[in-house]
Amino acid sequence: VGAVMPASTSNGIETWRLRTSKEQWIRWVYWLIGIAIIMYAWQMISEKTVWFFVTDAPSQAADIASRMVPPKWSYMDKLWKPVWDTINIATIGTIIAMVIAVPVAFATARNTTPNLIVRTIGLFIIVSSRSVNSLIWALILVFILGPGILAGTIAIGLRSVGFCAKLIYESIEEIDHTQVEAIEATGASGPQKMIYGILPQVLPTIAGVGIYRWDINIRESTILGLVGAGGIGLQLNGSLNTLAWTQVSLILLVILVTVFISEWVSAKVRGAII
């Protein structure tokens, strides 16, 4: 006897039908394949894991935690500039990303792209940017430009282009076309339709995406210093290398407060815009 499974009719009302034996077998095969993959992955992880360190991890964590308390508050004087650098990396990187992302989005959206070739190039830029993590961009740029906040800023910008452009071009494709048609009926040119028909509809999205990405970039820029790309992560890396745990705890607290404030600012600004 086949199992009962839900199905939807054309008018959206949920009905029920029996699952055939073939469908049941296919379902069981999928389950078995999934279980086999999980078991194989667990076996590979187990073979490459030193379980002594895993079992000893709680005591090691407790030991490190005890060394991190209390934080070295006097070290705060050396953190103000790295925090400011982190904010600058995120802010300037986001601005660079938005300057590139907006034209890429208009070139990629189906209703604004000049032709298929331009759209393909736009999609390639978006995918390339989204495929590479900001830490990898930072590593590459540190080798090219040397360590410092310039490498971190450009890394944040390159990583953010794809994220921002994707959200913006999807918003462009979902605009109300009646406004554009009304402007077109007046004999407006292509640029005029873009400026008066499309851009006003997507401006809130552009602003919202920019603020949202800035919030994300604050968090990402805190760790770029681990690869030499400036910011407070550079101080964190130095403290970790010297086992200065009281400094590490203070840096983590500063990062936590910075991220919390950036999220609060982002939420307030986006709430006012959207």
Task: Give residue ranges: language-model regions.
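C-terminal transmembrane helix and the adjacent membrane-cytosol boundary/short C-terminal tail
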Residues: 249-274
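Hydrophobic positions within alpha-helical transmembrane segments of bacterial inner-membrane proteins
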Residues: 94-102, 106, 110, 135, ...
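Cytoplasmic-entry segments and transmembrane alpha-helices of multi-pass inner-membrane transporters
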Residues: 104-138, 167-170
